[in-house]
Amino acid sequence: MARYLGPKAKLSRREGTDLFLKSARRSIADKAKFDSKPGQHGRTSGARTSDYGLQLREKQKVKRMYGVLEKQFRRYFEAAERLKGNTGANLLGLLECRLDNVVYRMGFGSTRAEARQLVSHKAITVNGQSVNIASYLVKAGDVVAVREKSKKQARIVEALQLAQQVGMPVWVEVNADKVEGTFKKVPDRDEFGADINESLIVELYSR
């Protein structure tokens, strides 16, 4: 499956929630009504969605939110199953450890897609070493930084300013002057309030 390159607002409307695919500088809420589906008239049928349909939709929503394709998403789920604890929470924890997501959480990119681009363009280092793999899993204590030659990019400066206004997640510690941050720990499930029902994904893959 190829990566989706179409309108981001359309995806959020399809899932009925903000997937955080667009910068908060231009809120997607201004362009899409999440309670209506894509199309001229949205969904007209009041038919009940099957359990399988709900499970599949939840998986699609999380994949789109984190920008992960099916094969890789399945690998994350299998890895989550091997870890101790709740499989659904483990799955989200692994997704939160992706380098592109950590760059986004630290405010260096205004969206995960923008953060992924910074990683692929070699603008990001981990513990002083350049890393250009978006799926690289960041560990507790790792220092993630923007390379010196990229620190003055307008999009990075603006994204960081916005993140400072909104507030940083508790599991990262960011030095805005150095444009670097420390990934303190894998976040607990209750620390990020994403509109996700991960148990539906576990049920889907357990069928």
From Swiss-Prot:
Keyword line: Ribonucleoprotein, Ribosomal protein, RNA-binding, rRNA-binding
GO CC aspect terms: small ribosomal subunit
InterPro entries, per database record: Ribosomal_uS4, Ribosomal_uS4_bac-type, Ribosomal_uS4_CS, Ribosomal_uS4_N, S4_RNA-bd, S4_RNA-bd_sf
UniProt KW RNA-binding keyword: yes
GO terms, molecular function: rRNA binding; structural constituent of ribosome
UniProt-annotated stretches for the region Disordered: 31-53
CDD domains: S4
Domain of life: Bacteria
A Pfam family of this chain: S4
Record GO biological process: ribosomal small subunit biogenesis; translation
Domain called S4 RNA-binding: residue spans: 97-157
UniProt-listed HAMAP family: Ribosomal_uS4_B (MF_01306_B)
Function per UniProt: One of the primary rRNA binding proteins, it binds directly to 16S rRNA where it nucleates assembly of the body of the 30S subunit. With S5 and S12 plays an important role in translational accuracy.
Subunit structure: Part of the 30S ribosomal subunit. Contacts protein S5. The interaction surface between S4 and S5 is involved in control of translational fidelity.
Family classification: Belongs to the universal ribosomal protein uS4 family.
This protein's name: Small ribosomal subunit protein uS4
